[in-house]
Curated annotation (Swiss-Prot):
The gene is aroE. Gene3D superfamilies: Leucine Dehydrogenase, chain A, domain 1 (3.40.50.10860), NAD(P)-binding Rossmann-like Domain (3.40.50.720). It comes from the Bacteria. Signal peptide: none annotated. Belongs to the shikimate dehydrogenase family. Shikimate binds at S24, R25, S26, T71, N96, D112, Y229. This is Shikimate dehydrogenase (NADP(+)). The lineage of its organism: Bacteria, Pseudomonadati, Pseudomonadota, Alphaproteobacteria, Rhodobacterales. Keywords: Amino-acid biosynthesis, Aromatic amino acid biosynthesis, NADP, Oxidoreductase. NADP(+) binds at D87, G138, A139, G140, G141, A142, N162, R163, T164, R165, I166, R167, L227, G250. It comes from Paracoccus denitrificans (strain Pd 1222). HAMAP family: Shikimate_DH_AroE (MF_00222).
Length: 282
């Protein structure tokens, strides 16, 4: 509810909105940057029930908030509540970053795709996306951001498989002819010849079932990445690495997607480095 929000302060406020939100690493992440750059700002967790979302969002700009991150289950809902929605957020169908303008208007953006690509480029600097097809496992909200960013980066073909095929078909309908849909039972086959492979599901996360996709078709030249970062080295990445592939864990996507929002809210472009990784994992 609105009356649980922090009292306005002279220092700018930002936070993460979700339900639940106690698990979020965003306060630790942004807190590290605020301390590192000596910024007199605050970043807080905001547990907001879905039925209170609109009320809270409209109140926040008047309480000293300059913006917010958005997590489950509000990433789709905020699009209808924002005054301005970026093209990429509209295409993906979700927003993870809100900017509260001085005139009270709410701008919604999605930086997940940016974070995904920036993570790969930081940890696999020789990656060339247009060398061959990309294969994406999963078709949920995170997958949509990955698909958009890979196509924008120039992959010549994007293969996708999802347990519910209709969701993959929806992505093909919205993102165009470069998207090729595979049946879930054929997910292993779509890895043949792929130069980039992404697990965009929650499978393999601690407490979740493992990702059961055959990896025999992986070539050692393939870059393999996983959006899951608990654990950092998922069984999927471990097997790919054992097959000679270069692998990139999912933590960096979380870190990089946060940077554009932090810069807009606090006026400092933050650095994503090993110190930040250690702070977020502590």
């Amino acid at each position: 509810m609105v009356d649980t929000l922090p009292t306005p302060k002279h220092a700018p406020l930002a936070g993460v909105i979700g339900w639940p939100v106690a698990h979020s690493r965003s306060p630790r992440l942004h807190g590290h940057w605020l301390e590192r750059y000596g910024i007199a700002g605050h970043y807080v967790s905001l547990p907001v029930m879905p039925e209170h979302l609109a009320e809270v969002l409209r109140a926040m700009p008047h309480m000293g908030f300059v913006g917010a991150n958005v997590t489950i289950p509000h990433k789709e809902s905020v699009l209808a509540l924002a005054d301005v929605v970026t093209d990429r957020a509209a295409l993906i169908g979700a927003a993870n970053t809100l900017i509260f303008r001085a005139d009270g208007k709410i701008h919604a953006d999605n930086t997940d795709g940016y974070g995904f690509i920036a993570n790969i480029r930081q940890h696999a600097p020789d990656w060339i996306p247009d060398l061959g097809p990309a294969a994406v496992i999963g078709a949920g909200g995170a997958a949509r951001a990955v698909v958009a960013s890979l196509l924008e980066s120039g992959v010549p073909e994007l293969r996708i498989a999802n347990r519910t095929r209709i969701r993959a078909e929806q992505i093909r309908a919205e993102f165009g002819a470069k998207v090729v849909v595979y049946d879930w039972a054929q997910a292993g086959n779509m890895l043949e010849g792929a130069m980039t492979v992404v697990n965009a599901t929650s499978m393999g996360m601690e407490g979740k079932p493992p990702l059961r996709v055959p990896l025999e078709a992986l070539a050692p030249s393939t870059l393999v990445t996983d959006l899951v970062y608990t654990p950092l080295m998922t069984p999927f990445l471990a097997e790919a690495q054992a097959r000679g592939c270069e692998v990139v864990d999912g933590l960096g996507m979380l870190l990089h997607q946060a940077a554009p929002g932090f810069e807009r809210w606090f006026g400092q472009r933050p650095e994503v480095d090993d110190d930040l990784r250690r702070a977020v994992l502590a």
